[in-house]
Amino acid sequence: APLFYLALGGPVLGWVYKAVNTMDSMVGYKNEAYLYFGRAAAKLDDLANFLPARLSAGLMVLAAAVLGMDWWEGMRIFFRDRFNHASPNSAQTEAVCAGVLHVQLAGDAWYFGTIYKKKTIGDDKRPVEAEDIPRACRLMYGAAWAAALAAVLVLAGIRSSWRRCASPCTPTYQRG
């Protein structure tokens, strides 16, 4: 998401995004101390990450296909489990990764000495193993390269359109 906003609006939009994201990290908790301000920060962060999370999931599916990984299973798990998280954005890419790697992610978690029941993402086809880390990194790097290529193509298209439009679209004034 930070790179998305940097590409979209340069350093200013990148800093605005980072401020929203940091605010959510610092006060976006569901407790009395930060109930209202924290909720606003969390909702703003959810809104800011809505499009980048979904674009990233699509880029991960594309990268899996190019890298010869099981992109179809990644897509299947994405459509099934993409909402299996309290955050509307967190499970988007996690679901693709779980499907591509044929593992189950998330589930119950311990926070401050208390276990919280949470939904799982993916099918429990095999246990997660150390070799999954380089596979997940390969998928992530592939998605990053796909994002960079997409950004270059979009920016080149915008620049090309701007140049074509510059001459005929520029009004000419006649002194009269």
What do these predicted ranges mean?
Residues A1-M23, G28-G176:
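Hydrophobic alpha-helical transmembrane segments
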